[in-house]
Amino acid sequence: MRISSLTLLLASAILCTSALGQVHEVKMLTRSAHAGMVYEPDYLQIAPGDTVKFIPTQSGHNAASLPGVLPEGAQAFKGQINQETEQTFTVPGLYGIQCIPHLAMGMVMLIQVGEPSATAPVLPATLPKRALDRLNLALQSRQVAK
């Protein structure tokens, strides 16, 4: 039995696509139905190798890693204001994400790559109060989702 070139091409395309991981979308919003200056969703749990696409649904926002909430060995990143940013997360752990211009207003989110640690994460006490409050709420929603 002969396998056609087209069959081999289709099979390899399917295998390569499934090995790349999923793409998750996060909206960057000035106002949502619930609050102002938010990422929607504010918490994601993804697999290593998955990509998150940060979409500037409303203008004036970016997505950047939050110093102090980054797994050891992970690369920091910083997207441009008003630009869609895609970031692939390969190192397991908890990532804090911030909108740099709106950090003081609490525009932050968490991304858990892989399974959460059994110990509760320690968030930097130097963060603005609103940012710290929102991160703690996101951590609580993570606990409820278990």
Segments predicted by a language model, with ranges:
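Bacterial N-terminal signal peptides that target proteins for export
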Residues: M1-T7
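N-terminal signal peptide c-region/cleavage motif recognized by signal peptidases
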Residues: C16-S18
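Extracytoplasmic copper-binding redox domains, predominantly the cupredoxin/blue-copper superfamily
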Residues: L20-K146
